Amino acid sequence: MIDPSHGGYDKGANFGGKLLEKDVTLKLARELHKELDDLGIPSRMLRDSDVDVPMERRAEITNEQRAGIYIALHAGLPGHGVRVYTSLLANPQQAATGRFLPWESAQAAALDRSKAVGQAVTSELRKKGMTVAALGLPIRPLNNIIVPAIAVELAPEGDDLQSLESSKRNAGIVAAIAMGIAQVRGQIGARP
């Protein structure tokens, strides 16, 4: 499941002028969807137009459809390069026991597989010469998703905000994400 963050009235970050995070992520999501399709990996997009999808609904849709992997796409400041996030739960072992998972720790059972996806994507991005930071954060909706889940956030190159729209740069990012997914998909038991 590819989730282009924000949308509709939620513009996300404003990079000046008409360059908005919601538009950057939607374009990137469409490119990733095509790249995965070209690799023979079926994927779905959580939104394919400029509509608002509330945060909790994003997790609900992903969980209901039992997506193989969830990838949230973001663009933001400050910094440069690419950041790859996985969930950071307060106590994943405690959250993973019992019959029912609390909503805020639904990711517990998939956390190791999420880390494997994050590591594979990070490795592919670095192979393309990109500056990458891999981080664990207690963020939504990652904590609420029951399948392997990562977030990938682009930051501009230096002060060049327009680099967020660079076709060449984004093609490299998309190819790296797709290759990372292709590498671990079978190992983590992911479905489309």
Regions found by a protein language model. Name each.
Residues 23-192:
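Active-site-proximal helix/loop segments of hydrolytic enzymes
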Residues 1-18:
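Short glycine-rich His-centered loop
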